[in-house]
Amino acid sequence: MQCRKCCFACEKWCFIGAKAFLPLVVNFLIIWACWVHAWLVCWEPQLFESDTTFWRVYGVAGVAIGIMCNVLYLKVCKVGPGSPTDIDNFSVPLVEYQNACSAEGQHLTPPREMANSVCAKENGGLRFCTKCIGWKPDRSHHCSNYKRCVLKFDHYCPWFATAIGFHNHKYFVLFLWYVTILCFFCLGSTGFVFYNHILEIGAMRGPDGNTDYVGAISVNVMILMVLALVFAIAVGTFATFSLYLVFNNQSTVEFLESTQYRSAVPTAAYRYTFAPTSKTVGNVFDVGWKRNFQLVMGDKWWMWLLPIQPSEAARGNGTQFPLNKQVLQKIREAAAKEVQIRDQNQAYIKQQRQQQQKRTQYDLPQHLQPPPQEHYEYDDEAQDSGDDIPLINMVNKNNTK
């Protein structure tokens, strides 16, 4: 037991350390890369015999891209992903939640924005977070690292020490692409220096093969060239994947997991088919690649490259999203089919029960059969004779002829 507590404590402190250390590493690498790219390479006149103006402009462009990377990084961390608990009526008071849990037949009233929700939890009901004690709108999930529910949750990024969600998704995608561009800028400048250095070694090699008099290349330049190549491949791949998700209007969670949609018959009731999901009927939030891109990056082309968010009127507040009408129609058809199957099966079960009751009544063994019914009739002759006998004689109809 003590060992488990130590493991949890160690994990907690490692997470806190990484949360504080990794953002420093990211910003340091960006600043260091700009310094090496601009000052040690592009602004070094000895490295280039001609086109010094081009390389100086090239260096300034790389620094501008690096500054944009830092601005986007700060935007991702400062703006945050957004949480449903920050929106009115989505948080439930603790006393009201406790009363609803303790009293039978008492239910919590969801906000009006939840009336049009298309996503459902496993039991078919509206999605509710018992950790945050609040309602979860479509595409929202609870992040254990962020310790809150996140609007349009994508993933938790330790390099930013925050979650990526509805409000900072655009900044995150732009950051990936600007870092990729910066890597290619640095790779171009350092690669050109390295290439010239190789040519210089070949041209100045003496008859004895001695190259001691050839100028040495900077260690910073070599390290930057290697890191730029590695990060260009890694971050570039992730940036391409993120842009693919933007065009499909999907988050990383929705790409990896199936989203269950609401049905007319919740799973908690007596169901006969599986509820419709994103894998069976399609992505209901996919409204076309162009509109999907505009919802995240903005309506105007100049907004696509700048850290400027579209207006809330254009993209909403993260609780409701435009829906694909064709997929929505499939969800409704699946719900109607489920209701039809349920009604047919319930009618069949009712009919079978009635037939079973009749069969049980007529198929009893002989010794369990009820005795013949006895009927009582008036004996008119005995009544007329005046004899002292009962006025009613018991006559068994089965024995009468």
Curated annotation (Swiss-Prot):
Membrane side Cytoplasmic: residue ranges: 1-20, 78-171, 242-401
MF GO annotations: protein-cysteine S-palmitoyltransferase activity
Entry annotation: catalytic residues: C157 (s-palmitoyl cysteine intermediate)
GO BP field: protein targeting to membrane
Signal peptide stretch: none
Main localization of the protein described in the UniProt heading: membrane
Transmembrane segments: 21-41, 57-77, 172-192, 221-241
Job description of the protein: Palmitoyltransferase specific for VAC8. Palmitoylates VAC8 at one or more of its N-terminal cysteine residues, which is required for its proper membrane localization.
Family per similarity comment: Belongs to the DHHC palmitoyltransferase family. PFA3 subfamily.
Protein name as it appears in the record: Palmitoyltransferase PFA3
Source organism (scientific name): Yarrowia lipolytica (strain CLIB 122 / E 150) (Yeast)
This protein's encoding gene: PFA3
